[in-house]
């Protein structure tokens, strides 16, 4: 060891490098001990990191094109470690043996080859990300994509090796330097290397400008659940009649579908390959992965994170090689030589071989980076409920009902703070442009959360044949009849939304209908709606794909019916696939109801009992330990009463999932709601019988007393039209 330490000197003076390729045997002054230890440490880090990256990426169950290209990056890092290790060996003996010339040549060849390969692959990865993010048509020739990725990697290695071996063919020479073996900068061969590097760097810089904005400077794309888009493809599902709800929303077919920020217009081109997977099945795997649902260990957020991290690593690697390339050209052009700059440039290129393992963290850090890395917005729920639980948030959504069971899609507007009117936006799969106006309303608990629900069990109606129906939302727009009375304002908030749908995806199969994040822990204290343990495992109905879903409201219930009476409430049982939920009887506090009216069929004569669309106003007062944190949710349902045997849906609403689901109660004519509490054994199920005959009597009364009788639903519709006219006038 003494001969090695004596060869490592603390003298900072370094020998002049010979410019003769035959002088590889003549060693320049050796490294100082501190630099030698630093290079050894960085080489060890690069070795461990490259092995870790290779093992992690090769053992992935499903690999994307980006991950496969990064795997080849790890091989380049191993080549860099090997080239530096060879030169470290050359530092040991005082007198160089005869085989040192071939070792130094091998070290220089590997160093230049991995440098060129690393930079070319950085540009290739950025180009692939740019291509997939802006691709509008999925290629049909993707069956050989996995083989193509390997072929591209081998091609890059072959080109890099060819360029690096030109000095062996007589163009350029390899010389020894104090920090390694490299090409002679006095040869025109340096200009060729710089031209290749500059071309790759220029293309990478051009493509990185839009990618940086898409991948790094935009919020994380929302995690769209299958049932949202599955139902949202039409504003009205079969069995949804014209309803009295007031939600002006554009259909996906009526608006231009823009690309989501950070996602591009085609997400399905990021292919996924499983180990041992046939090449012919790779296309299907890639297609399924990008339906915004997880497939194995690969999901869309992870795929997007891989693109983000790959972009960062590509820029990092190319920039770390920039000082070396510039210094080589400067030495060739003006003959400037600075050994400290040489050493710094070499250390930066060695550092470029240590950053690849960061890519493996893309799966764990799928949410990073966001908002240009620094401006990451806090969680919406934590903003909405941090410290001021007594604030009311207004939101409105649209609900469609299909054949007495199924999943429902809601579109809610931004949350609004009543104090400053500043919206707090959800990470919603749609963009909203909303205006909220308020009308006075008597309320003992402050401003209500207003939710508009449209439900029906009637046969499908052709919107083209309906007069006075908003074809966008399939909602009624009746003619005005009388001036609006201010003291009879029935709603506190009206929201007009223009919804711009971001991505249109399709989902198949009932097993995809119940979609939620299992990693989120239920917590009643922060008012995020939870699921009970009994509902973690989907229990499918025999009649369709509906599973008994997540939890809904908790609190007291009041019913407002056209009869002006308080309807009785009772518990009921829900059965599914042999499993039965029988909650205990619970006393429900019911407030005196208030008539919200109905719209009789104008074509029927007053003497007949015509079928009517009856509106039931249901208010749920949420309960929590803090009395100041009361929050009221209003539901307006449109139930078509055609007979006493009509079947109304049983609804469940999840605020976290932002959707309604329902169960068919068989032949029971009732309007039912499931109300879980913080006590698993104290969950409440209520059933509100539909007083069909009372509704019909009320309808006949309206026909017989046309001149002076007007229900609030008519006033409400007139108020809607007035508001709409004012908004259009402004």
Swiss-Prot record:
Induction summary: Expression increased during the early steps of astrocyte differentiation.
Any one GO MF term held by the record is: neuropeptide binding
Topology feature Cytoplasmic, residues:
56-68, 132-148, 210-308, 362-730
**GO CC list:** neuron projection; plasma membrane
Protein name stated in the entry = Probable G-protein coupled receptor 149
Topological category with respect to the lipid bilayer: Multi-pass membrane protein
- Name any Gene Ontology BP term: neuropeptide signaling pathway
- The organism's place on the tree of life at top rank: Eukaryota
Note the PROSITE patterns from the entry: G_PROTEIN_RECEP_F1_2 (PS50262)
Q: Which UniProt keywords apply?
A: Cell membrane, Disulfide bond, G-protein coupled receptor, Glycoprotein, Membrane, Receptor, Transducer, Transmembrane, Transmembrane helix
Entry similarity comment = Belongs to the G-protein coupled receptor 1 family.
Q: Which residues lie on this side of the membrane: Extracellular?
A: 1-34, 90-108, 170-188, 330-340
Which source organism?
Rattus norvegicus (Rat)
Which SUPFAM superfamilies does the record associate with it? Family A G protein-coupled receptor-like
Major subcellular site: membrane
Q: Where in the cell is it found?
A: Cell membrane
Q: In which tissues is it expressed?
A: Expressed exclusively in brain and testis.
Q: Which residues are glycosylated?
A: 7, 10, 20
Question: Which residue ranges does UniProt annotate as crossing the membrane?
Answer: 35-55, 69-89, 109-131, 149-169, 189-209, 309-329, 341-361
Q: What is this protein's function per UniProt?
A: Orphan receptor.
Q: List the disulfide bonds.
A: 104-181
């Amino acid at each position: 060891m003494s001969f090695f330490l004596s060869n490592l000197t603390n003298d900072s003076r370094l020998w002049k490098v010979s410019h003769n390729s035959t002088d590889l045997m003549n060693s320049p002054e050796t490294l100082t001990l501190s630099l030698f230890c630093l290079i050894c440490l960085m080489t060890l880090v690069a070795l461990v990191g490259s092995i870790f990256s290779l093992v992690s990426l090769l053992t992935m169950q499903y690999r994307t094109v980006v991950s496969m290209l990064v795997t080849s990056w790890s091989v380049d890092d191993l080549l860099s470690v090997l080239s530096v290790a060879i030169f470290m060996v050359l530092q040991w003996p005082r007198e160089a043996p005869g085989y040192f010339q071939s070792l130094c040549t091998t070290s220089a060849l590997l160093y230049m080859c991995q440098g060129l390969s690393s930079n070319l692959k950085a540009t290739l990865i950025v180009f692939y990300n740019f291509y997939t993010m802006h691709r509008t048509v999925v290629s049909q020739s993707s069956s050989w994509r996995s083989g193509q990725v390997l072929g591209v990697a081998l091609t890059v290695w072959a080109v890099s090796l060819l360029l690096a071996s030109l000095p062996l063919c007589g163009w350029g020479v390899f010389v020894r330097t104090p920090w390694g073996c490299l090409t002679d900068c006095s040869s025109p061969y340096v200009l060729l290397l710089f031209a290749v590097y500059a071309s790759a760097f220029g293309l990478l810089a051009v493509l990185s400008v839009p990618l940086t904005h898409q991948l790094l400077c935009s919020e994380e794309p929302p995690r769209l659940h299958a049932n949202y888009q599955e139902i949202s493809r039409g504003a009205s599902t079969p069995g949804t009649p014209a309803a009295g709800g007031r939600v002006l929303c554009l259909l996906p077919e009526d608006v231009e579908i823009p690309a989501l920020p950070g996602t591009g217009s085609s997400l399905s081109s990021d292919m996924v390959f499983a180990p041992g997977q046939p090449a012919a099945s790779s296309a299907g795997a890639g297609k399924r992965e990008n339906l915004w649902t997880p497939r194995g260990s690969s999901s869309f957020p992870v795929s997007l994170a891989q693109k983000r991290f790959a972009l960062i690593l590509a820029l990092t690697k190319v920039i770390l090689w920039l000082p070396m390339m510039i210094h080589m050209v400067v030495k060739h052009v003006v003959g400037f030589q600075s050994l400290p700059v040489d050493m710094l440039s070499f250390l930066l290129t060695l550092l470029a071989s240590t950053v690849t393992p960061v890519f493996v963290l893309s799966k764990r850090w799928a949410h990073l980076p966001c908002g240009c890395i620094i401006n990451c917005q806090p969680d919406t729920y934590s903003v909405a409920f941090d410290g001021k639980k007594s604030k009311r948030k207004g939101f409105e959504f649209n609900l469609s009902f299909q054949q007495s069971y199924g999943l429902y899609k809601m579109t809610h507007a931004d949350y609004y703070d009543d104090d400053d009117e500043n919206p707090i936006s959800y990470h919603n799969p749609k963009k909203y442009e909303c205006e909220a106006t308020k009308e006075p309303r008597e309320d003992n608990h402050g401003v209500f959360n207003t939710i508009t629900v449209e439900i029906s069990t009637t046969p499908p109606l052709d919107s083209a044949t309906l007069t006075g129906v908003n074809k966008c939302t399939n909602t009624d727009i009746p003619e005005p009849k009388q001036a609006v009375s201010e003291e009879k304002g029935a709603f506190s908030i009206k929201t007009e939304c223009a919804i711009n749908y971001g991505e249109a995806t399709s989902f198949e199969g009932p097993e995809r209908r119940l979609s939620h994040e299992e990693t989120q822990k239920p917590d009643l204290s922060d008012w995020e709606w939870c699921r009970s343990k009994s509902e973690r495992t989907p229990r499918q109905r025999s009649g369709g794909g509906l599973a008994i879903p997540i939890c809904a409201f908790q609190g007291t219930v009041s019913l407002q019916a056209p009869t002006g009476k308080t309807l009785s409430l009772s518990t009921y049982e829900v059965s599914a696939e042999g499993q039965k939920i029988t909650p205990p009887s619970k006393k429900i506090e019911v407030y005196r109801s208030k008539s919200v009216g109905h719209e009789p069929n104008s074509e029927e004569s007053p003497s007949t009992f015509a079928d009517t669309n009856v509106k039931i106003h249901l208010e749920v007062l949420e309960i929590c330990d803090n009395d100041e944190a009361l929050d009221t949710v209003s539901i307006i349902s449109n139930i078509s009463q055609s007979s006493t045997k009509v079947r109304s849906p049983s609804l469940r609403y999840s605020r976290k999932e932002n959707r309604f689901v329902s169960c068919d109660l068989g032949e029971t004519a009732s309007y039912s709601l499931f109300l879980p509490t913080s006590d698993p054994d104290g969950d409440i199920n209520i059933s509100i019988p539909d007083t069909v005959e009372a509704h019909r009597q009320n309808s006949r009364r309206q026909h017989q007393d046309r001149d002076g009788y007007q229900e609030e639903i008519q006033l409400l519709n007139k108020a809607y039209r007035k508001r709409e006219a004012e908004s259009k006038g402004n």
